[in-house]
């Protein structure tokens, strides 16, 4: 099995890159975020590889990091999620945001993925919630905030600040993570306006 490829970018397709490794061109399928982050043709690149072997084909999937590859594998343990859907999810949400979305039970964020409906998004969030800590470093403040929101214990200022950031166009996981950090910095008595200001500062980093 191929686990990693290091070579020169030859060309790009709609959902793949041709990587020239010592004269052999490998067609590697990638998430759109991965393709956008790769260099121009003629430049060097390294990809972690997941190899799929079928009776009629061998297909390679490429990732910038081993963590992204592990997410690709984990997503496919969910019913109705195959390689195509897993790549689509990773195109919509990078690993850190996906981890926060699952920690926050934010199925709406996952459902923004083209081809992923509410039922599949619900399964992803439900079935993977206990597996996230082993795979990604989820912000403890986000986990704590998730529990508070679930139990309706989140301070009104926190809930309002998250809502305001979402209304500004940020995703729920990003908004919640930013407000969690802002709340930790400003203290539990911080007002909505202060949390929004600090949250925006965090999101601009």
Swiss-Prot record:
Region (Domain II), start-end ranges: 65-143
Entry keyword annotation includes DNA repair: yes
GO biological process terms held by the UniProt record: DNA recombination; DNA repair
Cellular localisation: Cytoplasm
GO molecular function (one): four-way junction helicase activity
Region of interest (Domain I), residue spans: 1-64
SUPFAM superfamilies named among the record's database cross-references: DNA helicase RuvA subunit, C-terminal domain, Nucleic acid-binding proteins, RuvA domain 2-like
Subunit relationships: Homotetramer. Forms an RuvA(8)-RuvB(12)-Holliday junction (HJ) complex. HJ DNA is sandwiched between 2 RuvA tetramers; dsDNA enters through RuvA and exits via RuvB. An RuvB hexamer assembles on each DNA strand where it exits the tetramer. Each RuvB hexamer is contacted by two RuvA subunits (via domain III) on 2 adjacent RuvB subunits; this complex drives branch migration. In the full resolvosome a probable DNA-RuvA(4)-RuvB(12)-RuvC(2) complex forms which resolves the HJ.
Name this polypeptide is given: Holliday junction branch migration complex subunit RuvA
Organism encoding this protein: Rhodopseudomonas palustris (strain ATCC BAA-98 / CGA009)
Gene that this polypeptide is encoded by: ruvA
């Amino acid at each position: 099995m191929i686990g990693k490829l290091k070579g020169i970018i030859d060309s790009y397709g709609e959902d793949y890159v041709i990587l020239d490794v010592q004269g052999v061109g490998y067609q590697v399928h990638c998430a759109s975020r991965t393709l956008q982050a790769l260099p121009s043709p003629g430049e060097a690149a390294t990809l972690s590889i997941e190899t799929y072997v079928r009776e009629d084909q061998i297909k390679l999937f490429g990732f910038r990091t081993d963590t992204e590859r592990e997410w690709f594998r984990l997503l496919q343990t969910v019913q109705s999620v195959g390689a195509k859907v897993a790549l689509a999810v990773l195109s919509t949400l990078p690993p850190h945001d996906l981890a926060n979305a699952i920690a926050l039970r934010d199925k709406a964020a996952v459902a923004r993925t083209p081809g992923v409906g509410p039922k599949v998004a619900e399964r992803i969030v439900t079935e993977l919630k206990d597996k996230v800590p082993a795979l990604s470093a989820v912000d403890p403040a986000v986990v704590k905030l998730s529990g508070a929101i679930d139990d309706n214990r989140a301070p009104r200022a926190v809930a309002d600040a998250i809502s305001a950031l979402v209304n500004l166009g940020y995703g729920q996981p990003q908004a919640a993570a930013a407000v969690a950090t802002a709340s930790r910095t400003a203290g539990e008595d911080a007002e909505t306006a202060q949390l929004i200001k600090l949250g925006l500062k965090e999101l601009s980093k």
